[in-house]
Design a protein with these regions (language model features):
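Short amphipathic alpha-helical segments and helix-helix/interface helices
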Residues: 14, 18, 52-56, 156, ...
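Long, charged alpha-helical interface segments
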Residues: 71-77, 211, 221-224
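Domain-level recognition of nuclease-like catalytic cores that cleave nucleotide substrates
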Residues: 34-90
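Short glycine-/polar-rich loops that comprise or flank the Walker A/P-loop
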Residues: 24-27, 62-63, 126, 163-166
Length: 237
């Protein structure tokens, strides 16, 4: 999936190429994927939905291709492996402002925090991963979680007053993955806060604690990759 960060310039370039096509100019794009095991290509709608929407529009008229490459051991000569397929139906289905998400927070010191009706809870210092979902307006929901000034509503709102947000990880999807994500993170987390953020489901928790930033853990990033990308292979079948 491309890009790995928001690219406003990339979005504009794609739309400019499409506009040139409309004027009768033959235009195209070549994406080189430096991973020889790749079989399909999609714009990363989780990271940059605006670019993904622009790509979906422009792909209909551009002469474009995505090519997987294999490098030799000395990293001097790339070898073409295969042209990648474009599962555009996945993009049409999944690129919406809804889905599931994880918010990574840092608590600098041990704290006893009042969490609404749950009362006071002890939180060891460290990093916390909160899992949630939004059936619509997910971008606005994530922006809200990052603000401190707001009316208290969810459990996470109370904790946010004492933490800094280090990452937000949207997983745009029409599927209901929130509880699967929570169970996956729970399986690798050293501890969780019982009953946090899960009053409407049977999960043990939706808040999971780590001594160090989970963004730097391979098992956590594997969860991100699995829910953002690897599960799409099943949908394609």
């Amino acid at each position: 999936m491309f890009p790995d960060a928001v690219t406003e310039r990339g979005r504009k370039h794609i739309l400019e190429l499409a506009a040139m096509h409309d004027k009768g100019i033959h235009t195209g794009v070549l994406f080189l994927v430096h991973w020889d095991k790749a079989h399909w290509f999609l714009p990363d709608y989780h990271t940059d939905p605006a670019f993904a929407s622009a790509f979906a529009q422009a792909a209909l008229v551009l002469d474009w291709k995505a090519l997987a490459l294999r490098w030799d051991a000395r990293f001097t000569t790339p070898m073409p492996v295969r042209l990648l397929t474009y599962p555009e139906e996945i993009l049409r289905q999944e690129n919406e402002d809804r889905g599931d998400y994880m918010v990574v927070l840092q608590l600098a010191a041990d704290a006893d925090i009042s969490i609404g009706a749950k009362g006071q809870i002890h939180f060891p210092k460290g990093y916390y991963v909160y899992t949630g979902s939004a059936q619509k307006n997910m971008a606005a929901r994530l922006a809200r979680h990052q603000r401190k000034r707001k009316q208290m509503h969810w459990h996470i709102d109370y904790l946010r007053q004492h933490c800094s947000v280090t990452a937000v990880i949207p997983i745009r999807t029409t599927a209901d993955l929130e509880h699967d994500i929570a169970r996956a993170v729970d399986a690798i987390a050293p501890w969780h806060i019982p009953g946090f953020g899960c009053t409407d489901c049977r999960c043990a928790s939706h808040l999971f604690g780590f001594e160090d930033n989970p963004i730097h853990r391979s098992d956590f990033m594997q969860i991100v990759e699995d829910f953002r990308m690897n599960r799409l292979t099943v949908l394609m079948q």
